[in-house]
Structures are given as structure tokens and as C-alpha cells.
Amino acid sequence: MNYYIIPKNNFNIAINPVIKTELISPFISYSLIYFLNNIYTQLLNIDELNITENESNRYAGETTIEYINRIVNPFEFIHTNVPGSCLSVSKVKPSSNIFFELMEVFQVCNITDILSLKKQINIAHLTSNNSSTIDLLNMLREDNDDSIIDIEFDYKKIYETFIDQPLLMKVDLFIFEFKETDYTDTQQYIKNMILVLFIIVSNQSNSGTSIIKIDNIFYKSIVDILFIFSAIFEKVFLIKPSISKITKGERFIICKNMNIDVISHTKLLQQLNAHLKMTLIDESLDKNIHSIIGNEIPYYFSNKIEESNVVIGQQQLEAYDQIINIFKNKNKDEKIETLKRNHIQKCIQWCEKNQIPHNKFVERVNIFLNAKKKDDIKDNKKDDSDKKDDSDKKDESDKKDDSDKKDLLDTDTK
């Protein structure tokens, strides 16, 4: 698990968006972006070449980049079925892996303890995987009579529900997760994050908690939003759970203990309405949000974000490098089998640590590798047998020569 505490910010936030037609450029982690793009290109080229070879040769191997990607992820089989089996390691089968990711997050950040202080709380699950997040909260809250809002994160629907017609109640816990395609669309990713900021400032209860699943933090607007969160919440964490996919930059922002007084003092909601609300409903494709606040980001703050990018990015690069090396290796089937066995054990250990019931897997012998070993043993036995026969023949020949010499000596003596 990667765990970072974002520095507390006591600045007066000044909303002053910069909106231009130019493409959005990265704000930090330039070298990481370069290396990630480089290795993505290598993977795409290898995958295209493999597809071409498989099309031309129906007997070609079925080991794809996508398959190796699954094998390389250490905790893949907690939620997905183990290859060659119809079972996953965990006996608990939520519809999404976010169930297990949030389980780690709740434990590390002591969110369960905070939630237990109230008998009834208001929870908003703004994710397409809300069935998994609801199941987790029901398990942790022991089916308390909580008020629940569950909506798939559809941009227009979310805007209408929370911005056009603000909620009558304040929300104690927000859980946000975007659509898979939104994370790869930079413009939509930034607009989603601004919408999340609006929702939290407008609807979060005092001392409330928000959890947002995000991706890489490369752009100024995303850093600005983190900077605002560090001002209006007592604590802000960046966490990549160990169970998250190692080949992705996904992580969670955990914002604890909202301070309503800061929002009132800085007139943050009024500033957002005056400067950014129209941007949220503007569907122009030629307008990009490059920045949100007029404050200069302190070096210590940006360096902390950079640190998280470097560590998580290095893990991504190493995982991609491992995928390429396995794919090019002549003994890739053997390497994949070894990795699979090791990762099944890691998944079992994770389940035991988190008190999740798990299935038991008996180690199966690879019949092809076993056959090869048997053939090698047979060949070795045959070689030993041939050597023994040659040795026996040589001994018999030597004995015959000695006998002939003896007879000759006896004749000479006579």
C-alpha cells in the first residue's frame, strides 16, 4: 500500500480559473509521463504483432499481453477467477473490486471508527459500482438505518441532482468513482473533479468524510482541487491500496473532517458559483480548464504530490517491464505458472489478514512441464544404460584379452 498525508493548507482560496483553447499540458511529473508513454507504445506494438501472428497461425500461442497483465497483478485473483478454475480466492463475491479497495482504505484511515460515532448517517454512493460500496457499508455499519443515495456517476444526472436542486440534507460520507472512460479523457476527468468539488462544498456535513477514486495527478486543475481540499478538510490522504491494479495509476483521495467555518470564511461556494458554475454546463469541446485557483502552489505541497506520482509510477513501469520480459521469454509458460502460484498465496494471506473467507487451492502439476521432465529422466536413464553396456562390453573384452595372454604364456612355458 502507498500512503501519503497531504500538507495542511491555511491559505485563503481565490478561485480564478484559466480557460483556454490550447491543449492541457502537464503540471508535474514530466519524466514519468514520458516513460509511461514510451512503454505503452512498446506494449501496443507487441500486442499488435502478437494479434497478427495469431491470425496468420491458428496454432500460435494463446498467451496475450492482457492475460500476462492479469498474472502480473499480485492481488488479481482475490476478486477474479484463477485461470484454470471457476473460483476466485475470496469466497466473498462483490460485483466490483472497489469493495476490497475501500475495505483497506477504511481500515488504514480509521473511517469505520468515525462512522460508528453516529447511529444514523447519510451516505451518497456516486459510482456505477454502488452495489459493492453499499454492501461494504452495510457490513461495516451492521445494517444501521442509514439514509442512502446511490446514483451512477453520469455527469448530467449528477449535476441535476446535486447542483440544480441542492439536497435538503447534508451528507456525512461521499464515495465517488467515475466511469472507466472518464479517467482517460483529460477534459472530462477535470470537469468531473470540479463537479465533485462543487458537490462536497455544497452538500457535505460538518466533520463529514469524502472518498474519491482518481487516476494520475499530472494536471494543474487536479492539483488545485487537492489544494482546496487540504484547506477545507482537517486531513487529506492519498492512498493506493495494495489490492489495486499495479499497472494502473488509480488511487484514492480521502478527505476527513470537513470544516464548514473555512468554507464560510473564504466564501468558497459563492466563488465557485460566480467563476466556475457556467463552465460545468458548457459543452464546448474547444475550451479546456488549465487552472482553477489564483493561489501559487507551494513547492512543499507540489513535491508531496510528485512523490506519490514517482512511487506509484515506478511500480507501474516495473510491472509493464515485467510483462514485456515475460512475453519475450522462451520459458514464459513456466514463469507465468510460478507467478500465478505465488500470487494465489499472496491473495490467501490478504484474505486471512482482513478476515475474509477464502477458497483453498491445491497446487496442480503442469502436465506439459511434467512430461518434459519425465522425457529428460528417460533420456538420462537411457544414456546411463548405454554407458553401462559399453562398460560391460569393455570389461568382457579386457577379460578375454587377459585370458588369451595367459593361454599364450602357458604354451610358451610348455
Predicted ranges, named:
Residues 1-166, 285-378, 382:
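Intrinsically disordered, low-complexity glycine/charged-rich regulatory or linker segments
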Residues 110, 162-176, 189-206:
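Structured alpha-helical segments in the cores of large, soluble enzyme domains
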Residues 123, 174, 210:
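Receiver (REC) domain switch-region micro-motif
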Residues 128-131, 179-181, 216-217, 243-244, ...:
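Conserved beta-strand elements of beta-rich interaction domains across eukaryotes
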Residues 183-238:
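Conserved Class I SAM-dependent methyltransferase catalytic core
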Residues 221-279:
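Class I S-adenosyl-L-methionine
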Residues 381-406:
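Long, intrinsically disordered low-complexity tandem-repeat segments
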